[in-house]
Amino acid sequence: MTTHVPRASYTEEELSKLYPKELELQLVQILLRHGERTPVSPRFQNTGLPPYWPYCNAARQLSSVIMSTTDFTQWDQLKYRRRMETFGADDSPVIASGPSNEFDAVCQPGELTDKGRQTTLALGQRLRHLYVDQLQFMPQLIADSDSIYLRATPIPRALESVQQAFWGFYPPSARTADFPPPTIITRNPAEETLFPNDASCRRFGQLSRAFAQRCAERWNDSEDMQYLSNLFSKYMPDQAKVAVDSRPRLSGVMDTINATDAHGPATKLPKHFYDPKARAIIDKIAVDEWFSGYKESAEYRMLGVGALLGDITSRMAGSVEGNGRDGLLEIGERPHSSSDGGRGRGGETGIKLALSGCHDTTLAAALSSLGAFEGENWPPFTSHIAFELFKSKSASASKTPSHPSTPPSPSLTQSTLPSSQSWWSSLFGRAASPTQSPSSSSNTTPSSIARKPLSSLSPSERATLDGYYVRIRYNDRIMQIPACKAAGKHLEGDKSFCTLEAFKAVVDKVTPKNWKQACNSRLDEPAFPEKIEVPGYE
């Protein structure tokens, strides 16, 4: 399946079961895959598939921020339209055109298309219907975005998708006239953990290549691959056989099939490419190549998605403490500061909603690392995961928020670890954030339990987690974490509600203390563990 087909809205009966009265929703974190896009590189032009697609009308109405005075006091916008230039027959420059000689609205490789904008906008509208209209979790009208965390990877389609989803969740009619610009968090690509970053994490690059090679050895000479070659070889360069590591790779073939399937008749491949059996084979092998590492190797999970899962869980823990400092940390504010850092900043009471624009590899990696991706297909465009944090109304009535009086100890580095500690324990388990440094003077001290592994919590800190539950929904389907099925690890009568303590214990096992250090460790060690390390358990 290329495009996610959403289910109908939950009925009142379904809502009463999904959101029981004894629980109160406290925090929602959404990971959303970008919407439909063009292929990341042109392929199969020998079939007549145009290299340039006319599905990006945003290119007709782009704008850039312009400094209009030399004293930095005035800023404006330059509106413009984009056209693509390419090589002509004799290498002279020509304007690229679509299949019907369109010059405007022509897409770049991997660009979010009009349909991708449409489906991510619709996702935001569906989320609004659930969390605003049906559950009254978020307000109908907002004056600022202080309780909302927006984040995206450096890839433009991810940023544009989260912008579209936010617009659907809170359209202009649901924002006050003086609504200030929302903050959207991004990272340097070398520090990006919102997708499995094999380009910047050397050890993860080694692991991913090793598992990809194993996949090639497993499938290249199989009957399934022969079936694909019988269909597609005549379109491959030099009529080569299709293989996991062919050129284009099998995952590249899938990329073009999925992108063409999601768009109009002018950009379609020959019908053989959409053969149902062939697509099922491609999906199965691609999932094996890209995601089997998460199901077999704790190190793979740690380097690929552990930092992200640690961020999600620490935000939950910060929300539980109830002091709002997790919100301040997310947008870079100082608590009790006289400066508000701009309109809509400085009065945070804690993040309630997080929207993160990411990728298919993010979603599958997160679910696989929690033991919740068994038997799943490749995530379609505009798929999403909702991590929902609940608190028991009976428990919350008997507890008050915890306000730690002493800061946590600094995180350990490799040089300060005792010599008897193994490399494994030195890399796992997120410690507290470092103390302030010249490069991060605006950092605030994290809340006491947000960045501490469960094993390091005191009895009183651990008790703070009591009465809180985590539930995961993937494309509106409830997903089950294996560790949460055990007695005492879930809400009585419903195994889909994992205790926050059990959820944190699972995530702690894959959360690196220092991701960059882990990425440059074990470079001479074998890629595969001695035995399969099953995910989703404490």
Residue ranges, per PLM feature:
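Signature for phosphate-centric chemistry
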Residues: M1-Y149, T153-A354, C358-E538
